[in-house]
Amino acid sequence: MRHHRGATHAPGTEEKMIPRTAALLALLALTGCAATGPVTPETVTLPQVSHFSAQNPGERLPTGWQPWTLSRFKRPTEYRLVDYQGRTVVRARARGSASGLVHPLTLEPERYPYLQWQWKVEQLIAKADNTQKHLEDSPVRLVVSFGGDIDRLPLADRMFFDNVRLLTGQQLPYATLMYIWENRAPLDTVIANRHTSRIKMIVAESGRDRLGRWQEVTRNVLEDYRRAFGEEPGPIIAVGIMTDTDNTGDNVHAWYGDIEFRRNRPAAPALASQN
């Protein structure tokens, strides 16, 4: 694993048959908007993120993790606990698909500003470009959702939130950060979502240089939120992972290791590099 790096559709047949629904689903194809599961702090009690490595390969997901479905019209990505050189990790396989795993929690980013995780990507998605909504795919995403007062948001955002709630029965988080692996955009680039100002993507890795090796990434979520949204964050209410290729229709494999929030910046990883 590498030392952490800090800050410095094709439309389906069903959609063609119901164009109004297809148009609305296009708005929901925001790499995670349609259904994130429980996202209000009152409904969760888990103080931290359950480790994948605590389970045995082939077992069910650790307590707290749950499927994250974007739309019944989208093929889900396959997630499994597998052994990787003696360690249990999550393997993701996407085949023109999009779905994720989400873990609700309640955490104050001021107390736990550092987010650390591991991921591994074998190949990039050739046509992916997260600055273009019709090519918005990533082999790996680490997603952090924040609570807040939705009534404070601009009218356009509130209307978008209302539309999502009417269609899915789910309330969008007040704000969402997505850490992605981009093809070309420079490290630390902030990419705004095309439909709402409350979802921002941050390029945590870019290009081909580190493909095929485990990467350990550390981000200061507090600083990233301030930079992306220009305000102080509310509580962290969920963390998730997602591998998606629904817009490009490509096939991709990726792996995710444990995810942790920390009070202090972690030291260098014990394993500097691992294939």
Task: Kindly give the residue locations of the regions a language model identified.
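Extracellular beta-strand ligand-recognition surfaces/modules
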Residues: 140-142, 197-207, 211-249
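Extracellular carbohydrate-recognition regions
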Residues: 36-70, 155-160, 273
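Secreted extracellular polysaccharide-interacting domains
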Residues: 91-111, 124-127, 196-204
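Short carbohydrate-recognition loop motifs
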Residues: 77-99
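Extracellular/luminal beta-rich ligand-recognition
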Residues: 137, 148-195
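C-terminal motif of bacterial Sec signal peptides marking the signal peptidase cleavage site
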Residues: 31-32
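Extracellular-facing segments of soluble proteins and assemblies that are Gly/Ser/Thr-biased and enriched
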Residues: 111-165
